[in-house]
UniProtKB/Swiss-Prot annotation:
InterPro entries: ClpP/crotonase-like_dom_sf (IPR029045). This is Putative uncharacterized protein RC0838. Gene3D superfamilies: 2-enoyl-CoA Hydratase, Chain A, domain 1. It comes from the Bacteria.
Length: 98
């Protein structure tokens, strides 16, 4: 199963975390490996800093904490998955294994 990140700068936000968890669960149920592939030359810029900044500026610490917890849960799900989770990236038209 291939999971393609298509959001700007391949940033990680609620939607990406939920979809990653869903993809990992489906891959586990199907007994297939999960390949994570972002579009563009960079794998990921990391967390969506614009979203984090908006939470901080609005003093919305509840949603900030929920995003951080969701990210941690997602990474643990991928780390301890019963199938292999493989991160890929492309550069100059060739596949690179990380």
């Amino acid at each position: 199963m291939i999971f393609v990140i298509t959001i700007k700068m391949n940033c990680l936000n609620h939607e990406v975390f939920y979809l990653l968890q869903e993809a990992a669960s489906k891959a586990e149920n199907d007994g297939k490996n999960l390949y994570i592939y972002p579009q563009g030359n960079n794998f990921s810029a990391g967390a969506d800093l614009k979203l984090l900044l908006s939470y901080i500026e609005d003093k919305n610490f509840h949603d900030l904490e929920n995003l951080l917890k969701l990210g941690q849960q997602t990474m643990l799900h991928l780390k301890y998955s019963s199938v292999h989770v493989i991160s890929l990236w492309s550069w100059c038209g060739t596949w690179r294994w990380i």
